[in-house]
């Protein structure tokens, strides 16, 4: 005995009942393409719109009686379709012109005619369109739903080439239905979804009855993407975790962490400035003693602090002003730019002496650990800050790059310290230099007298340079060697005179 199901002549409730009966006989397809079972009334490949007959236990072929089933589905698929089965199905459809699905199913011992029909309609049919929906297709579905109602999907699919009834039905219920609520989920809806999921599990159609305006597909997506992670917290406390509010696209948690970090940094900068100010006040009093309880190492380390992170980004002076609430963006559109504050920086003597040498008031004979206070400027603004030149900003920025030569650093002048043991030799060298300098011009002597230890002497004639070089060599010649040289020179002169007299005679 067989029964048929005509969707065109049945009511929506009867069609849904028929779909449930047909879907009980379907098998889940494991292919990547959608192959879930739906109503057989969704437009088959043939011209007839009647569903194929459903075999009863009395019409089971003898080859399948070994299953021993007397009720319910007759055959179940043992797995996904193999490439060999797909090729066999194509050949059978070509043989029977896609009309007799009972004869087509005879080619598969473990497949029913419904499974073969769905495999062909949803996967193998070359005329099937699986791509995204176009605007024209959506308008056509809306027009046909107004004409036929949201039930006769097989008739609606006939007006959309390449689409089947199941695709049209899912497109309407998930996207095109004007009753769909597409607003953001409220807390009440999420709590209702939590409670319904505890009762029904993953039965999204049952849960959708509790949430009017939400489709089962939207409910499933929201559960898997958001609420599934909050379910443990809800089961423990009975309420949802507090939502993470955002401020201009930045979560409050990130804003709080950044503000706390800024407070710590600015607090350390303020503490550094206060310690440095105390030390400078002691230096201005003229006392060489430092009676501060702060360790000297900490003060030195704090005085060298010029940026929040010297090695992670470009150098900048610390800014005690808080950042604006819009995530650090200024009113003029620039990001992460702060006006440098001068009052929070004090250079130490070690750094200043390395840059400027001993010309800024730093004495080499001072204590090993001392501090330098820059000389006060006469021009003072109304707010108490002193004007600065661009070179000072460049010098401070250059200090943040260690082991790098700087164009602003000056050479240290060499200081020659005389030793008492070499005083005698130095006096002799001075006497020789005095004899050599007798033939020099007065202007040259005056220039040399102003800078006695200049490493770059003025230009001299070659003969004078040779004389100076010889005079420097005399420092290492003793009196006896000088006498021996004089005797040798006199004997050479006598020999030359005798030789000349013989040639003339």
Swiss-Prot record:
SUPFAM superfamilies: Homeodomain-like. Disruption phenotype: In double mutant myb3r3 myb3r5 and triple mutant myb3r1 myb3r3 myb3r5, up-regulation of many G2/M-specific genes leading to larger seeds, organs and embryos due to overproliferation and ectopic cell divisions. The keyword Repressor applies. Residues 53-62, 380-389, 444-454 have a biased composition (Polar residues). It is found in: Nucleus. Residues 73-124, 125-180, 181-231 form the HTH myb-type domain. Residues 422-443, 477-496 have a biased composition (Basic and acidic residues). Its main location: nucleus. Disulfide bonds: none annotated. Coiled coil: none annotated. GO terms for cellular component: DRM complex. Induction: Slightly induced by ethylene, auxin (IAA), jasmonic acid (JA) and salicylic acid (SA). Component of a DREAM-like complex which modulates a variety of developmentally regulated genes and of the mitotic genes in proliferating and differentiated cells. Associates with RBR1 in both earlier and later stages of leaves development. Interacts with CDKA-1 and E2FC, but not with E2FB, at later stages of leaves development. This is Transcription factor MYB3R-3. It comes from Arabidopsis thaliana. The lineage of its organism: Eukaryota, Viridiplantae, Streptophyta, Embryophyta, Tracheophyta.
